Amino acid sequence: GGIIGGGSGAAAGAIIGGLIGKGKGAAIGAAIGAAVGTGTGVAIGHKMDKKAAEAAKIEGAQVEQVTDANGLPAVKVAFDAGILFGFNSSALSNDAKASLRDLAQILKDDPTTDIAIIGHTDKVGTYEANVKVSKNRAYAVENYLQSCGVSSAQFKKVEGVAYDQYDESKTAAQNRRVEVYMYASEQMIKNAEASN
């Protein structure tokens, strides 16, 4: 595994506060409606740095530090081969399950971490069929993480975006993936504000 865009607590890479799936989804992380103070952002940034470092130790994990809808640091985790799916399949491989068990431990350690899961497909077949497959992939990951003890309350968004975010620089097999986002819940934000 490895961290892409890793840095200090408040530093972040790509912005995910925008819409996922070219307008077909809501922003990652519900906006809390009030400005978050710098101290709160730094505190959450340190938590997310720790989560990113832990996730980077997972075999095959690609970890990227991103920003949520509140402008706070968040973490995106995808896998080289662990959560790649066969053609038209949402079945998790044994390697995928092993990686997800490790990720589940990170998620269980802090129940104030919210989770979004986004499923993706290649471009073979109809768009409608790919939407269904991408949703099934996201739900397969959610269900497996829950079977590993992650609280259902942590899952705030689970969706499939088919090939709306197809990466032309990758192979079709690499585009058959699921991305897991870890970001601050409203409770994590309140806890960070209270400690400042």
Where are these regions (language model features)?
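Amphipathic, membrane-active segments
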Residues: 47-76
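Short, low-complexity, glycine-enriched hydrophobic/amphipathic alpha-helices that associate
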Residues: 1-54
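Second-shell loop/turn segments in exported
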Residues: 40-42, 84-93, 127-130
